[in-house]
A protein has these predicted regions:
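Rossmann-like NAD(P)H-binding beta-loop-alpha module
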Residues: 133-181, 185
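A Rossmann-like FAD-binding core segment of flavoenzymes
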Residues: 27, 73-90, 97, 163-264
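Mid-to-C-terminal Rossmann-like scaffold of FAD/NAD(P)H-dependent oxidoreductases
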Residues: 2-4, 281-375
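Glycine-rich Rossmann-fold phosphate-binding loop(s) that bind the pyrophosphate
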Residues: 9-13, 35, 126-127, 147-152
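A short, polar/charged loop-to-alpha-helix boundary motif
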Residues: 375-392
């Protein structure tokens, strides 16, 4: 009996890849390994509907799906290493599994802040278990401190305010999302949070945490010397690729300073024979010649299609590869098409408080569109990013 295709990581990218294998007609064994005990689930609702108690169901596929598709799903199974010469992966229980092809889809883990004391009431948010714990503690919280005003931090701030909890949001950058969207857009996001009563403190970080006599967090001391009272703390300072299990594999990894991850070509093929990478952990080759990770929900499905087609020897499918991501904060959906960069030129097309539209450009050519509260208007511009489009033409057409 031949070895199966083994997918390490039962998140969205791993699931989409398993689905694509069956959709493409692959009839061999498919083994999906996940280190969590929960079947594949949707992460975006964790910081929003789930933590607010509005939904309990984040499952991506019903239990019978895997049996129907003849996909073997093994949960609670941690992979600790890979031998690319022998084509085997090692498990935490000491056993090994042979593979015909290996697909790495291990995703990310939350970045920790070094030096913070280990006290009760301090959380990160990545896994379902994190969200469950956070939701349980939110019920009795009165004042929350969120460290980091990236997407997770901003979404949690909105969810906590909706739950009636006072929120202090601390961010070392000049504005929320500055390193992702730039300071000008970050200022518009900051305005929204300030309007909702968030105590937003930018340009400072957290130096240490305070704890009460019972060992539970009671507040923080910032790097500027100010103090914050809090009975709930969330650290949201980004994530790092889960690649430690590949340390001795010989598979080429991106440098940590460049974002880390598994280096791969434009279809997910890594430096090792019969080894592929997909999803948040994968630094794919892009049209610009740069290899980088794209941490977007829609990218997981797009990459899975390209990878599976290449793995099975087919021609690359014709498909739009315009990146898309979104973030729900309060009653506003923030959407981005393309790749926004703080280094690009920015044109604010419209700004009506909770609704705004902006174009990013480089050398006059559109590189990204970002909008808040303008869902239809943003999505209509997707085609403009598929081919070089001068921003001046868009502005002229809009009158």
């Amino acid at each position: 009996m031949s070895a199966p295709i083994v997918i390490v990581g039962a998140g969205l990218a791993g699931l989409r890849t398993a689905e694509e294998l069956r959709r493409a007609g692959y009839e061999g064994g498919v083994l999906l390994l996940g280190d969590e005990t929960r079947p594949p689930y949707d992460r975006p609702p964790l910081s929003k509907q789930f933590v607010r108690g509005e939904t309990d169901d984040t499952t991506l596929r019903p239990p019978e799906f895997f049996a129907d598709k003849n996909i073997e799903l093994r949960l609670g199974t941690a992979v600790t290493g890979v031998d690319t010469a022998a084509r085997t992966v090692a498990l935490a229980d000491g056993s090994t599994i042979a593979y015909d092809q290996l697909i790495i889809a291990t995703g990310l883990r939350p970045r920790r802040l070094p030096g913070l004391p280990q006290v009760a009431g301090v959380h990160v948010l990545r896994a379902h278990e994190d969200a469950e714990t956070l939701r349980a503690e939110l019920d009795g919280a009165t004042r929350a401190l969120i460290i980091g005003a990236g997407f997770i931090g901003c979404e949690l701030a909105a969810s906590f305010r909706a739950a009636g909890v006072e929120v202090t949001l601390v961010e070392p950058q000049p504005t929320p999302l500055a390193s992702i969207l730039g300071e000008q857009i970050g200022g518009l996001v900051a305005r929204m949070h300030l309007d909702e009563g968030v105590d937003l403190r930018c340009g400072t970080g957290v130096d240490t945490l305070r704890a009460d006599d019972a060992g539970r967090v009671s507040g923080a001391v910032c790097t500027d010397g100010t103090e914050i009272d809090a009975d709930l703390v969330v650290v949201g300072v980004g994530s790092v690729p889960v690649t430690d299990w590949l340390a001795d594999s010989g598979i080429e990894l991106a440098d940590r300073s460049a974002g880390g991850g598994v280096l791969a070509d434009e279809v997910g093929r890594t430096s090792a024979d019969a080894v592929w990478a997909v999803g948040d952990v994968a630094a794919w080759q892009h049209d610009t010649g740069v290899r980088k990770r794209v941490e977007h929900w829609t990218s997981a499905g797009e990459q899975a299609k390209l990878l599976v087609t290449a793995l099975l020897g087919g021609a690359p499918p014709t498909m739009s590869r315009v990146p898309y991501f979104w973030s729900d904060q309060y009653d506003v959906k923030i959407q981005a098409l393309g790749t926004p960069s703080p280094d690009d030129d920015l044109t604010i097309v419209s700004d009506d408080g909770r609704k705004f539209l902006a174009y990013y450009s480089r050398d006059g050519i559109l590189t990204a569109v970002l909008g808040a509260g303008l869902t239809g208007q943003v999505m209509k511009l997707r085609a403009k990013l598929a081919t070089p489009t001068p921003v001046a033409d868009l502005l002229a057409a809009a009158g």
